[in-house]
């Protein structure tokens, strides 16, 4: 089995790791950083930029720079979460034919899995550059509180990126694997994971290589992006109060505010006060305006107080579901960049009554855990058993619009559960199975995962036919549902890609598009390399021609000048082969010029070396004689 990489596909940053010599290693990207911004930009020329390159140009290209796409993955355009995003995003979020939230950039529509796939391709390339071989197998992490649609969409993103996704693993569970791999004692731990876009809390029991998740809870729309937004709103309000100008209408200014908010938030984790300086942020009739504000840690904590308060509820619920009290927890592991905020650490301490454990790197631990799980699947890591859970209850709609649960939340996966249902009317020929996920009592308040129909039921009074509905959740947390008429043996099943999500045809098309772009990127790189080499050749040839042009005859000189002109013309185009051909022709034409340069350099070299002023032939003979003598000595 080939190498298996572990990828933490984050809202703000992503990270890739691999097992080497029994140890997990985080791989640095081409820019030398161990984490990569989860950003994608499309330039005027149609070039795709991913990671740091995309982030660098975000201020000047806000409408075509995509970030925090993970918050759209597997979500409906009409959902409350997406409506919130639309209100604050500089890029365009549109409704797809299937009702999903997609993005539109430069007139072209992209699904969230497609954009996420571009980030995954970057992580794949990072691993391949390090290993020196092609990588196809991967373990990808998702927030523990992701529902089925979001998990399926993440798996689709992996497929589009050219990866064989062996397992989708929950982020807190991955962090627990990384933390507990070398721990020998039995302990109960809480993994508190507050990242760029999502918040998860998982309670686990560790012992003898068994990692058992007891419960999980969270909020898939609470993270660093929300903290940044609150800071942006405060900066914009202060500037409006001072200057009377609302910066929120200017996308370029808004992008600068976003960068400043993120920077200030990070700085206030280690200092008590920071300056926010943004010169030339805008202008009016009186001239340019500059933004200069002081932000203290106390003020930041007041600005974000409502978000901090939201962290407590899921923690209490997770403890209750696990049947534990805060005193039963041995360690609280902090995961995600947001846990560096002192106020977050204090909140964790208040909830659990103990100082949180900061022994793991919050940015890298999830990718490390994913790599360990890859090692388990590959057989490199022995004696590790991971028992994860499904975060939300699963069931179907029954008479009266009620949700009847078949699998309760926090059930260990993989799992399978069946229940017998019947018809609601006499001689009912078919039953419609409405698959739901959620904790509310009425089906309309829960998330629809899919609908399918079991038809061909023989005429019978209501309540007589026996329809067995079976739910099957695989190790990725992805749901399969089947319905069987026990009287006829007729069966109908659905693998939930549902009304939400991409069809197989759409995924296949996106895979082809991704491959095409990969070869396009290769061609672009070849063109840039050819241009660089040609530019260097043209410069050195012109320099030599200026110095030694009088040492060669006019016909040779003209041939070189023609070659130079042809090369410059080829460089204006975008045909790498034409540039290479013109470069080769110029090199051929420049042979006489090279001889002249060499001849000029030769006497100088001889004098420098103290060589006698004799002909070339004599020099050659001396070398030959030396060579012969050495050979004879050897004999």
Curated annotation (Swiss-Prot):
Per the UniProt record, the lineage of the source organism begins with: Bacteria, Pseudomonadati, Thermodesulfobacteriota, Desulfuromonadia, Geobacterales
Region: Disordered; residue ranges are 598-635
The protein's name: Chaperone protein DnaK
- A Pfam family name for this chain? HSP70
Feature: compositional bias, Acidic residues: 625-635
Q: Please give one Gene Ontology molecular function term for this protein.
A: ATP-dependent protein folding chaperone
Please give the family membership noted in the entry.
Answer: Belongs to the heat shock protein 70 family.
Task: Please give the InterPro entries that the UniProt record associates with this protein.
Answer: ATPase_NBD, Chaperone_DnaK, Heat_shock_70_CS, HSP70_C_sf, HSP70_peptide-bd_sf, Hsp_70_fam
Q: What organism is the protein native to?
A: Geotalea uraniireducens (strain Rf4) (Geobacter uraniireducens)
């Amino acid at each position: 089995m080939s190498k298996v990489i572990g990828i933490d596909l984050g809202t703000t940053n992503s990270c890739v790791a691999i097992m080497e010599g029994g140890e997990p290693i985080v791989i640095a990207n081409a820019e030398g950083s161990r984490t990569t911004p989860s950003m994608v930009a499309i330039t005027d020329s149609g070039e795709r930029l991913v990671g740091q390159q995309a982030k660098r140009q975000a201020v000047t290209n806000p409408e075509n720079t995509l970030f925090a796409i993970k918050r759209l993955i597997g979500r409906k355009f009409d959902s409350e979460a997406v409506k919130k995003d639309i209100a604050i995003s500089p890029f365009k979020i549109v409704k797809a034919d299937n009702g999903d939230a997609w993005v539109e950039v430069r007139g072209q529509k992209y699904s969230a899995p497609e954009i996420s796939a571009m980030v995954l391709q970057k992580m794949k390339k990072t691993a391949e550059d390090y290993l020196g071989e092609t990588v196809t197998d991967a373990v990808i992490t998702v927030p523990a509180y992701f529902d089925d649609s979001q998990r399926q969409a993440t798996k689709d993103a992996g497929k589009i990126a050219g990866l064989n996704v062996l397992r989708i693993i929950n982020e807190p569970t991955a962090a627990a694997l990384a933390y507990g791999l070398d721990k020998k004692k039995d302990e109960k731990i809480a993994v508190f994971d507050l990242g760029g876009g999502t918040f998860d809390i998982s309670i686990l029991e560790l012992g003898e290589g068994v990692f058992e998740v007891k419960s999980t809870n969270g909020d898939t729309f609470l993270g660093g992006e929300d903290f940044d937004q609150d800071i942006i709103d405060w900066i914009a309000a202060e500037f409006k109060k001072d200057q009377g100008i609302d910066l929120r209408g200017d996308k370029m200014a808004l992008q600068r505010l976003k960068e400043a908010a993120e920077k200030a938030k990070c700085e206030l984790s280690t200092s008590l006060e920071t300056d926010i300086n943004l010169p030339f942020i805008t202008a009016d009739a009186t001239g340019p305006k500059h933004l200069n504000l002081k932000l203290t840690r106390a003020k930041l904590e007041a600005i974000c107080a409502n978000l901090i308060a939201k962290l407590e509820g899921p923690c209490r619920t997770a403890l209750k579901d696990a049947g534990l009290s805060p005193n039963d927890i041995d360690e609280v592991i902090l995961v995600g960049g947001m846990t560096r905020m002192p106020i977050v650490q204090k909140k964790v301490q208040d909830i659990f009554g103990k100082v949180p454990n900061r022994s793991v790197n919050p940015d890298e631990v999830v990718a490390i855990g994913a790599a360990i799980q890859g090692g388990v699947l590959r057989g490199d890591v022995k004696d590790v058993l991971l028992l994860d859970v499904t975060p939300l209850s699963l069931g179907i709609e029954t008479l009266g619009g009620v949700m009847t649960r078949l699998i309760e939340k926090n059930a260990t996966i993989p799992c399978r559960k069946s229940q017998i249902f019947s018809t609601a009317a006499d001689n009912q020929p078919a039953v419609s199975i409405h698959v739901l996920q959620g904790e509310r009592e009425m089906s309309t308040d829960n998330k629809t995962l899919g609908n399918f129909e079991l038809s061909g039921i023989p005429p019978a009074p209501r309540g007589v036919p026996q329809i067995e509905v079976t739910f099957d959740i695989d190790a990725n947390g992805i749901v399969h549902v089947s319905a069987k008429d026990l009287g006829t043996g007729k069966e109908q099943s659905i693998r939930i890609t549902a009304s939400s999500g991409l069809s197989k045809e759409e995924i296949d098309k996106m895979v082809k598009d991704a491959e095409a772009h990969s070869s396009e990127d290769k061609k672009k790189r070849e063109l840039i390399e050819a241009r660089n080499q040609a530019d260097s050749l043209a410069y050195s040839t012109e320099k030599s021609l200026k110095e030694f042009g009088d040492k060669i005859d006019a016909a040779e000189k003209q041939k070189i000048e023609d070659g130079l002109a042809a090369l410059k013309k080829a460089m204006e185009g975008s045909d790498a082969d034409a540039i290479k051909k013109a470069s080769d022709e110029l090199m051929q034409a420049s042979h006489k010029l090279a001889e002249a340069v060499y001849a000029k350099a030769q006497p100088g070299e001889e004098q420098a070396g103290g060589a006698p002023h004799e002909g070339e032939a004599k020099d050659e003979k001396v070398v030959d004689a030396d060579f012969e003598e050495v050979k004879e000595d050897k004999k």
